[in-house]
Each structure stands twice: as C-alpha cells, then as structure tokens.
C-alpha cells in the first residue's frame, strides 16, 4: 500500500543507493516538519485510517507528532547508518486555520518544550499569506527563520526557544495582570510602525465570554 510515509522511506533508500554508487554516504542532520492545518477541523477523509476523522485533540496530536518524530529518526539512522539522530524542527500552525482552542499550535509548542530533540522555530502568523497559505515572501521569510534556528542549534551548539509566556499572574490591583515572557532577543516590542496597531495589542481578558469580533472560526 502506498502511503506518504512509505514514500519517505523509499526516498531514504534511493538517496542511500545513489550515494553508495558514488562511494559516498548520506547524512541527515535535521528534519523540518510543517503540518497541522487540517487538524483544526475534523474530516473523515483526512484521518490516519479510512472513515476515521483526523484528530483535533491537543494531547492526541502531540502523541502522534512524537511517534512520527521517533519513526522518522529511527528510519534515518537505520538507512544511513549514522549515529546521531537528526533534530526535529517544527513550527506553530497559524493563519486562517487556527481556532479558538489553539489545540494544535499548543501541542507543537509543548512538544518542543518537553523534548530536547524537538525545536519550535516559532509561529507563522507574522508572515504574509494568501488565503492561509504563505505567499512567496512569507515562505522566504519563514525559511530564513528555519535556517537561523538550525544554524544556532546544530552548528553553534546553542539552545533556542521561541517567544512564549513563562508566567501569568494577577497583580495586587484587581484589573491588572502580569505576563512574563521568554524573549529570544530582547527587548519585546509591540510594532505599530510596520503594522497597524491591534486592539489591546491582541490581548483579551474575559470571564464567561469574549468579544465576538475576536472569534476565530
């Protein structure tokens, strides 16, 4: 049965054969994985098995992502004979595919925070897109992000974590909330020069319900 994963393993074998025919060896230092858009809405045609919808659950997606990472790494080690596992660099799904729960985007970020060989290069919401898919400039832009993260982690041996909250607390005043962030390159800046100012800088604190104009559907 032909599947995308079997195609992946076939490509490993073919690349190894070509390298071997020239007395060379293949080596894979990194896997770039960008996926998750179709896991925000259930669809019986998009699941792992026939008539089984794709998962939209955060924990299930994270489990499957980790399993896929392990499978790809092990197949690369077996086929290429290398000793070091390739690092797994992913992103956070964004644009029009996201929904209120942020389930898939959070699964991707959490996996990178929990596993040393998974690195999240960051979200794609700042990049330019057309109908959800990044346009040529958006892919160029995020491709540079992927290259920067790979170089910093695998070549320079440094660590990388994308911008993310580390602590959220209520202040002494009842109408104040303090959010602490991990900022890769300080300071954290709200850009109102290249982009129009977003209402409340994109933050919303609510009890029970939120502003309907902010709903992501």
Spans of model-derived segments:
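Cell-envelope and extracellular/periplasmic
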Residues: 1-217
